[in-house]
């Protein structure tokens, strides 16, 4: 049986768009369309969506789009944008910050400063998100994400 994304529209109606134009999702305002665009509001919904597509589609997780060049050719897969609950930021204790992957680097830097935590200053001028910064080990001024990262929680393409 062939997998069809259209079958998921009733279940994910507000957050799943087919044949989606990606131009406005990156800072360069360039690029073509994606076969599908899914906006994940929370972890539970993301897991549910990933389990439904069951590795039948290519996946690209898009952060702020600040360091992303999108081809004019159609992306034959699903672009996932993490929103809402992935923007959470809090203190675990006096020395450790928990930040969602959609938190901007600038916001993480400001949060650290407001809570008297040093070492995050370099993030104030990096345009992007925590998730993207970790993926590419973003950095400047001789500091990188590897210098502030303790651990991550991640999902695989199967939602586990």
Question: Model-flagged regions — what are they?
Answer:
Residues 121-123, 132-160:
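FAD-binding subdomain of flavoenzyme oxidoreductases
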């Amino acid at each position: 049986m062939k997998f069809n994304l259209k079958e998921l529209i009733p279940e994910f109606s507000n957050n799943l768009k087919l044949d989606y134009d990606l131009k406005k999702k990156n800072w360069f305002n360039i690029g073509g369309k994606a076969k599908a665009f899914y906006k994940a509001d929370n972890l539970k919904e993301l897991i549910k969506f990933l389990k439904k597509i069951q590795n039948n589609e290519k996946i690209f997780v898009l952060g702020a789009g600040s360091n992303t060049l999108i081809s004019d050719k159609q992306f034959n897969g699903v672009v996932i944008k993490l929103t809402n609950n992935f923007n959470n930021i809090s203190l675990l204790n006096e020395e450790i910050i928990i930040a969602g992957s959609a938190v901007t680097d600038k916001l993480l830097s400001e949060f650290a400063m407001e809570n008297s935590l040093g070492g995050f200053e370099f993030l104030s001028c990096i345009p992007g998100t925590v998730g993207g910064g970790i993926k590419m080990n973003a950095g400047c001024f001789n500091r990188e994400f590897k210098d502030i990262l303790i651990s991550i929680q991640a999902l695989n393409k199967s939602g586990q």
